[in-house]
């Protein structure tokens, strides 16, 4: 049972319903996290817009941003975000071996030096951000522009927020929408 209720499509304003419908079209569900945030429409709107800007704009590949999101979620022990973003990462071309290899990325041949620097940033920001040195930043900057560093930091920071929110609520992974929910939103179910 959820610690805080998750609002159904029928319980939100028409404006938020449009965002729910976009989630249903794009993902086949409305993430429980966002259904919980819907209790505060202003926060819901800004969080969905922020997530879109962080993950889907800029010059870095979304695959790389999702890779650091998965590592951040591993470090925070957030099953909810891990389930969702592992699936997204796999769809974007990350392999199951790479997902598993994130746990020992320093010794893994599965990641480029640029990817290792991004993963290191995820660990530093999540576990010991005050200790991230000028030398570490210079190593990161060998591979990424200032704007790209901002993109990485925004993804890592955003998911530290999302992870902690979901951990406190003991949020279970979002299930696919029912045929009824999809029909209500005018979304055709995907046939297997």
Which positions does each model-derived feature cover?
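Hydrophobic alpha-helical segments
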Residues: 1-192
């Amino acid at each position: 049972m959820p610690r805080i209720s998750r609002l159904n499509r029928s319980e939100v304003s028409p404006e938020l319903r449009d965002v729910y419908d976009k989630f249903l079209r794009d993902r086949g569900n409305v993430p429980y996290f966002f259904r919980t945030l819907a209790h505060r429409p202003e926060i819901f709107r800004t969080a969905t817009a922020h997530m879109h800007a962080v993950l889907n704009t800029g010059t870095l590949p979304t695959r790389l941003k999702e890779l650091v999101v998965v590592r951040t979620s591993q470090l925070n022990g957030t099953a909810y975000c891990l389930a969702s973003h592992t699936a997204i990462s796999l769809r974007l071309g990350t392999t199951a071996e790479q997902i598993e290899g994130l746990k020992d990325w320093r010794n893994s041949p599965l990641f480029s030096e640029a990817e290792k620097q991004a993963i290191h940033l995820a660990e530093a920001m999540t576990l010991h951000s005050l200790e991230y040195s000028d030398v570490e930043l210079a190593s990161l900057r060998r591979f990424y522009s200032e704007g790209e560093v901002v993109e990485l930091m925004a993804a890592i920071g955003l998911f530290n927020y999302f992870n902690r929110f979901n951990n406190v609520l003991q949020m279970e992974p979002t299930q696919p929408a029912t045929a009824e929910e999809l029909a209500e939103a005018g979304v055709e179910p995907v046939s297997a």
